[in-house]
Amino acid sequence: MTTAKRDTYTPETLLSVAVQVFIERGYDGTSMEHLSKAAGISKSSIYHHVAGKEELLRRAVSRALDELFGILDEEHARVGSAAERLEYVVRRMVEVLMAELPYVTLLLRVRGNTDTERWALERRREFDHRVADLLKAAAAEGDVRADVEVRLATRLVFGMINSIVEWYRPDGPDGRGGTGGAGGAGAAGEREVVDAVARLVFGGLRKSS
């Protein structure tokens, strides 16, 4: 990856560089030497700001988790029917994933080998359970088809949303987000992705009117 210039170094750029290195090499496969070279600064400069790479990991996954949990505190996630709140949360999850793509990608790839990773996994489970509770509530209110198994549906919804990190790239043609991979398999703006996920999820879940 491109080495950051020393004269542009800030704690925020260090975190951004660290996230990219963690994603590329894996957290366990990343040393402070790797981070030093990628950031273009000495290891002592890094230690001036953080205790070590695990603190960088915690800051990175905390950023993703704070954004996700923040969705649940927004007004439209708390007011209205369960189905309305669920759709709002799903849409906002996709928006946050795309806006914080590297940070959410890293969050989804932690393995649980360190205290920070185990903490992040526990927080992820807590978030997932709260969204699952919304789906259960929507089913209890009669807004979900009777033939839909709620637990399976929850897993499929999260699977669809989380898979976006594998193909979505914000620097698609003409500044629009696009799919990754050779040949540039088309482009999709952020709003198009959000709308497509919502249509697929709720077109399958909702009862026919």
Predicted regions and their residues:
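Hydrophobic alpha-helical connector segments
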Residues: 59, 70-99, 154-157, 194
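Generic detection of well-ordered alpha-helical segments
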Residues: 8, 12, 16, 20, ...
